């Protein structure tokens, strides 16, 4: 499966647009991470616990989006993007989305 942020895939043309596909996940902070983060913000620098949590969330959202595209029989997802939002205090949603398409080699 090809995933690209562009609207075209070099060497291919879009044969059919199958529709918008998405995958999301809501992750919450962990109390231990919050305590460590509070100390880290005083000293400055990367908060590795949150970085790891967001990386995991992006990977889960991407995987879910790809599964949705595969169910439609897509060869690729074009116009791929991530979005994030705060759902409630201490919880964030990561959304992966794009357009599922069938490709034809040119």
From Swiss-Prot:
This is UPF0145 protein TM_0763. It holds the Pfam family YbjQ_1. The lineage of its organism: Bacteria, Thermotogati, Thermotogota, Thermotogae, Thermotogales. SUPFAM superfamilies: YbjQ-like. Gene3D superfamilies: Hypothetical protein apc22750. Chain B. It comes from the Bacteria. Belongs to the UPF0145 family. It comes from Thermotoga maritima (strain ATCC 43589 / DSM 3109 / JCM 10099 / NBRC 100826 / MSB8). InterPro entries: UPF0145_dom_sf, UPF0145_YbjQ-like. HAMAP family: UPF0145 (MF_00338).
């Amino acid at each position: 499966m090809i995933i690209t942020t562009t609207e075209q895939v070099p060497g291919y043309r879009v044969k059919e647009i199958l529709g918008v596909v998405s995958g999301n996940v809501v992750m919450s902070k962990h109390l231990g991470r919050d305590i460590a983060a509070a100390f880290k913000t005083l000293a400055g620098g990367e908060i590795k616990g949150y970085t790891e949590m967001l990386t995991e969330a992006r990977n889960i959202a991407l995987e879910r989006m790809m599964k949705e595209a595969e169910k439609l029989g897509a060869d690729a997802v074009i116009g791929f993007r991530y979005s994030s939002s705060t759902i409630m205090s201490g919880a964030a949603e990561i959304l992966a989305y794009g357009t599922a398409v069938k490709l034809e080699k040119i």
